[in-house]
From Swiss-Prot:
One of its GO terms (biological process) is neuron projection extension. Its main location: membrane. It is a lipid-anchor; GPI-anchor. GO terms for molecular function: identical protein binding. This is Neuritin-like protein. Keywords: Cell membrane, Glycoprotein, GPI-anchor, Lipoprotein, Membrane, Signal. A lipid is attached at residue 136 (GPI-anchor amidated alanine). The keyword Protein transport does not apply. The keyword Endoplasmic reticulum does not apply.
Amino acid sequence: MMCNCCHCHWRRRCQRLPCALTLLLLLPLAVASEGPNRCDTIYQGFAECLIRLGDGMGRGGELQTVCRSWNDFHACASRVLSGCPEEAAAVWESLQQEARRAPHPDNLHILCGAPVSVRERIAGPETNQETLRATAPALAPAPAPVLLAAALALACLLGPLA
């Protein structure tokens, strides 16, 4: 299921934006209207989280770097929501659950949430650091088009407000 971004002149990219991400971007509006002065800076906070996520993704396409940025984004978003009503945390969690179920090959919840297993190479009776090798799922290219779409959707949403 896809959402349309009707105010955006980058319509083709916005049409590819998953609804879960659109809801994530609309979360600040819903939360800000819920409580008195507890979420005054939620737009600024989420914008800063998204900018940091984009900056982190731009540092390199290695899965470890991408996942570190992704995990930092979630920690940042949680800090932004910490001063908001409890309903905001429930919405955030439901968005994360929906995103985890999305059957996209570049789903960061799946790529970054996969456990890293350690297997031992059989090299003799001794076990040391050289005989242990971490394995993880095959590296996938960084989902730059999805991040670009997220940034464009945010610009679409914030554009009429400015």
